[in-house]
């Protein structure tokens, strides 16, 4: 595994199963990581275990990215591992459900990327976003998350074209995984 020492990587959603596993893998490969999560006790415990820095921030809060930028100025990469799952039939889906999920999964990802776009460009960095297989395959009661993550996939291909060749943008779309929200 390549040594990524001195190149800072941000992990949003660092207390979730995906984010914490990624943090551990990057740290074990020698990367300099910075964790971002809303739960202070959980993110602090992970940061202490891994010997890395962290910011307590909720991506649903206005100005969350400024809080992160107060702690980190330059980065090489970013993983937006924030996720949610709100399963219900279409007849029960509300506009508020859709707005919250879009804010969490799409709008805040855009704000995070915009906040570090210049640094990523300067450092020829990379961005990893997360979707779900439900965005491409039909699953009952997945209206909220599937449509929101499909928007994340659209963002990914758009930014990959817009940022090339300076910033690489990819999206991972796992199926069910063993996690707190699965």
Where are the model-predicted features located?
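Substrate-binding pocket helix/loop in short-chain dehydrogenase/reductase
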Residues: 89-90, 94-102
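Active-site helix of classical SDR
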Residues: 113, 148
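N-terminal Rossmann NAD(P)H-binding glycine-rich loop of SDR-like oxidoreductase domains
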Residues: 15, 23
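Residue(s) in the substrate-gating loop at a strand-loop-helix junction
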Residues: 132
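Alpha-helical segment proximal to the catalytic Tyr-Lys
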Residues: 118, 160-165
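Conserved Rossmann-fold SDR core element
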Residues: 163-177
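Active-site loop-to-helix junction immediately N-terminal to the catalytic Tyr of the SDR YXXXK motif
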Residues: 93, 138-146, 158
């Amino acid at each position: 595994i390549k040594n990524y020492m001195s190149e800072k990587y941000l992990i949003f959603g660092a207390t979730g199963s995906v984010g914490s596993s990624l943090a551990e893998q990057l740290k074990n490969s020698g990367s300099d990581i910075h964790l971002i999560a809303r739960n202070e006790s959980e993110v602090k415990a992970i940061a202490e275990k891994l010997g890395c820095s962290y910011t307590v921030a909720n991506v649903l809060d206005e100005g969350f990215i400024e809080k992160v930028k107060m702690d980190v100025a330059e980065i090489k990469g970013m993983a937006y591992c924030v996720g949610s799952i709100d399963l219900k039939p279409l007849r029960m889906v509300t506009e508020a459900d859709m707005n919250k999920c879009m804010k969490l999964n799409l709008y805040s990802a855009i704000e995070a990327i915009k906040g570090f776009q210049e640094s990523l460009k300067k450092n020829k960095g990379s961005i990893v976003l997360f979707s779900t297989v439900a965005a491409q395959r039909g699953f009952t009661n997945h209206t909220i998350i599937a449509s929101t993550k499909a928007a994340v996939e659209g963002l990914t291909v758009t930014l990959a074209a817009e940022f090339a060749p300076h910033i690489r943008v990819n999206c991972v779309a796992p199926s069910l995984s063993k996690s707190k929200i699965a």
